[in-house]
């Protein structure tokens, strides 16, 4: 009887040990995150960092066991990270291209897209600039090099050459104007400059009377105004018109209301591109961004 009890005890001990060792094993990927817990890093276009920081703070406050760490980069490098499976989530201003989708599927992946928001591409100028309205047509003339001086757009202007400044040569802003406004052609203005980040674009325009900067509208709000209705006072936000001749009556600034009712003409879709086989925290954060709480 004692011998049988001994065998039973040893057997139960072995079963318990095996169960414990199996439960301690991590997945082959090394990830242990769930839909609402764990730690991940994800890539995001740098131009969306003000939005992402706000959303991240709310998400981590709501889900105490979750930590999401953004890697701010440009659109091209962020997409490469996703394709190389160095991240499972990318926040950017375009969807997958067909060849990118196929590349991921050919390797046994199941990439998905979620539309999370809409953003205005803002045109900013020096705060002393009295020429505050511009048509999409004239902006295209600046991009393609047809208009290189302020007087080409505003006859009589004495501001000289237009200094056109973007955040980054590989950014979503550059991709948007080339794809949506220039029909896939490159920017041809000889006076175009890349300032590396959106913050540097704002700083450059604030110090350069003849500049036009192109940035995401989420960078414009005055941090002192909790209603988000006051733009940064160091620069002027230009009103943009869909019509051939811009006037104060037919031109609009990139307030959220004018973006959502389609009055403002330069609108980008913000996407969450996901390639997460675990359906873990990348999915949880992406769905939070599109939810009413995230909006």
Language model regions located:
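Pocket-flanking alpha-helical
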Residues: 76-107, 223-225
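Short alpha-helix boundary/capping motifs
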Residues: 87-89, 109-111, 232-234
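Acidic, polar ligand-binding/catalytic clefts
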Residues: 91-114, 242-252, 257-258
């Amino acid at each position: 009887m004692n011998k049988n009890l001994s065998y039973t005890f040893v057997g139960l001990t072995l079963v318990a040990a095996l169960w414990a060792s199996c439960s301690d094993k991590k997945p082959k990927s090394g990830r242990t995150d769930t839909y609402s817990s764990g730690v991940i890093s994800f890539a995001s276009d740098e131009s969306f960092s003000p939005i992402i920081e706000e959303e991240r703070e709310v998400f981590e406050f709501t889900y105490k066991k979750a930590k999401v760490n953004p890697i701010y980069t440009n659109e091209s490098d962020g997409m490469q990270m996703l394709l190389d499976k160095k991240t499972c989530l990318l926040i950017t201003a375009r969807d997958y291209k067909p060849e990118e989708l196929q590349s991921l599927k050919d390797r046994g992946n199941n990439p998905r897209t979620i539309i999370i928001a809409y953003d205005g591409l803002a045109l900013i100028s020096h705060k002393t600039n009295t020429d505050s309205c511009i048509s999409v047509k004239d902006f295209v003339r600046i991009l393609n090099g047809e208009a290189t001086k302020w007087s080409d757009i505003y006859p009589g202007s004495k501001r000289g050459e237009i200094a056109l400044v973007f955040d980054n040569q590989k950014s979503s802003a550059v991709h948007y104007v080339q794809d949506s406004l220039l029909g896939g052609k490159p920017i041809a203005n000889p006076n175009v400059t890349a300032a590396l980040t959106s913050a540097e674009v704002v700083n450059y325009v604030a110090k350069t009377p003849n500049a036009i900067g192109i940035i995401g509208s989420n960078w414009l709000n005055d941090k002192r105004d909790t209603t988000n209705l006051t733009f940064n006072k160091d620069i002027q936000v230009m009103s943009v018109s869909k019509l051939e001749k811009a006037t104060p009556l037919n031109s609009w600034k990139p307030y959220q209301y004018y973006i959502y009712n389609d009055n403002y003409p330069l609108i980008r879709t913000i996407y969450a591109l996901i390639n997460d086989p675990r359906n873990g925290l990348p999915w949880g954060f992406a769905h939070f961004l599109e939810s009413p709480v995230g909006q």
